[in-house]
Structures are given as structure tokens and as C-alpha cells.
Amino acid sequence: MSLVDSEIIVGIDFTQNKRLNQLLSDSAYFPLVLYPADDAFTAQSPLLKEALESASGGEKRKLLVIVVDATWFFAKKMLRLSPNVRNLPKLSFQQLYTSEFTFKRQPAEGCVSTIESCYHLIREMQSADIVPAQIDPEPLMAVFRRMVDFQLEAEQKRIAMGIPGRHSYDAERDVNRKKRQRRQRVENPASSKS
């Protein structure tokens, strides 16, 4: 499972990160940070397509999406500490998605995990003809769903063994989880293929 042409850059403050700054200063790219904002671009934004086509030398600019992989608390901290990332234009989704990360509660409606974000972003970029249709993001969600199922099974084993929970989510108290999962997969079969 991988995203072609992706790189992982680890840290908290990226202000002096040589590799990231090299990418951000490369005129071949149009850099955006995948993060919610009222003025965020979406895949369908005409301004996004204009920005990608406005390269010098007649070549289209490549979309460079910075995906912050952290809890919401640390994602905010990373942006606060990294003005080179914080000041980038934001990229968000056309619509709100419901997270399938049923093991962990999201802080608000429309908040999804990093893997889900990448999946939905690819799908929206495909619908806008920015990403080729032959790129298949389904393996991302297949692995993600297996990970969630594994986490939930481990939680059930923990409960059966009488070990106290350490998370804000506790499957013991969420008796409707499986019903919600089934209903979500029936209502949205395209995103629930494994």
C-alpha cells in the first residue's frame, strides 16, 4: 500500500526542514495543505485548475498536497509552529464525510483520519479530472478497514478479559457500533468495498 510519488517527512516544526522547503520553492509544483478552512480550495474549484495551468514555460504545475498526519490537537500545533506550511493555501473536500474510524471518536462532524482523507481526496480529484481514473485508492480503505476491525476485536478481547480501557472510546459502552457500521456500508457501498 503506497501513494505513488509520496514522501514522508517526520517532525513537528517544519520551518527549517530542508526537503519540505525545497519542494515548496519548486515552481513546478502548486503546494497546498490538506486542512479545513472557509477559503479552502476543493477539487472542483475553478481557481485550483487555473493555478495548476498557470506555470511558466507552458507546462502544467503538479499538485503538491501536504497531508498532516497527526491527531487534530497535534495537527494544529504543527501548523502553528510551521509558518511555511500554515501559510500555504488550504485544500479541503467538496462534501462532509463520516469517518469509518469507529474505534476513535473524531472531534467534529466531517473529521476523518489521514488514510480516509487521502482516499476521499483522490476520489474528488478523479471526479475533477485532476487525478487519472486508473489510480485506485480502494487498497487504502481496505487496509484501513482491516485495521479498524483488528482494533475493535482487540477491544472486545480486552473487555472479555476485564482489563480497564485506556481510550475515550470504549466498545463496551457502544452497543450500536456494528449496526452503524452495517448501515454505513449499505448506504455508501462505493466507499465500503474491501
What role is predicted for each listed range?
Residues S2-L3, L121:
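Generic structural signal for bulky hydrophobic/aromatic residues embedded
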Residues L3-N84:
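S-adenosyl-L-methionine/SAH cofactor-binding core of RNA-modifying enzymes
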Residues L63-V65, T71-S194:
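C-terminal folded domains that constitute the principal catalytic or ligand-binding module
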